[in-house]
């Protein structure tokens, strides 16, 4: 409805059909399972998007996000929604991400920032170390994990280079989330071009990976404790 009101969509002659890609993440393990998103929520989100800088943390798709779920929700931490952007000359690249991962999140210094807690929930454990110790598949592995990201640029690209851009942005996932792209994760990234600035796809791809890496860290650092899950600020240090 929001797009139709603004005459945005694929022109089929008699009308314009809005093309809307979508993904979902599993957050029914927190809050009320009776709550459902509505068309009005989506419309309001579209209106809010152009008014100010996007909110981060426990908002929108980030409301029910969690990370570090290798041992289930009992040792998981709260995560959320994060953004980050870079500019070089006239070329701009931004990333938005809802981090709902099985693994832990690491900072650019290579140190863990948030994720799987130890059995007493007093400090961080390490998902990779616990996985390597198991060797055999973990029992009852929590499979409701999905990190959803978007990279946006004002660079002028069509579908083919944008597909490459989305793939390069996954390097940001690999730097910030460990492990990532597991069989228990439904990780995906969308890439959008909103401008006409000439740009090298390799440059834009490298920028996209960096913005995504930083957006993931902001997603966990902005998420406060909620639904019985510890947030980054409340993590004992």
Predicted segments, located by residue:
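A structural signal for small-residue-enriched, beta-sheet-centric alpha/beta enzyme cores
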Residues: 1-237
């Amino acid at each position: 409805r929001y797009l139709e009101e603004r005459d945005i969509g694929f022109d089929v002659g008699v009308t314009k059909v809005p093309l809307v890609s979508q993904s979902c993440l599993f957050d029914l393990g927190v809050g009320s399972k009776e709550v459902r998103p509505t068309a009005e929520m989506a419309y309001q989100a579209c209106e809010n998007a152009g008014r100010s800088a996007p909110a981060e943390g426990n908002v929108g798709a980030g409301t029910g996000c969690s990370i570090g779920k290798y041992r289930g929700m009992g040792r998981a931490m709260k995560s959320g929604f994060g953004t980050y952007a870079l500019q070089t000359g006239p070329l701009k690249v931004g990333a938005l991400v809802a981090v709902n991962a099985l693994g832990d999140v690491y900072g650019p210094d290579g140190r863990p920032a948030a994720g799987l807690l130890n059995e007493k929930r007093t400090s961080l454990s390490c998902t990779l170390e616990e996985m390597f110790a198991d060797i055999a598949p973990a029992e009852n592995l929590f499979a409701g994990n999905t990190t959803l990201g978007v990279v946006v640029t004002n660079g002028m690209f069509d579908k083919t280079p944008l597909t490459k851009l989305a793939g390069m942005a996954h390097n940001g996932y690999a730097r910030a989330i460990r492990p990532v792209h597991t069989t228990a994760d439904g990780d995906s990234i969308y890439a959008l071009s909103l401008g006409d600035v000439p740009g090298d796809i390799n440059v834009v791809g490298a920028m996209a990976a960096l913005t995504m890496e930083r957006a993931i860290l902001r997603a966990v650092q902005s998420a406060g404790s909620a639904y019985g899950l510890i947030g980054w600020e409340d993590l004992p240090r």
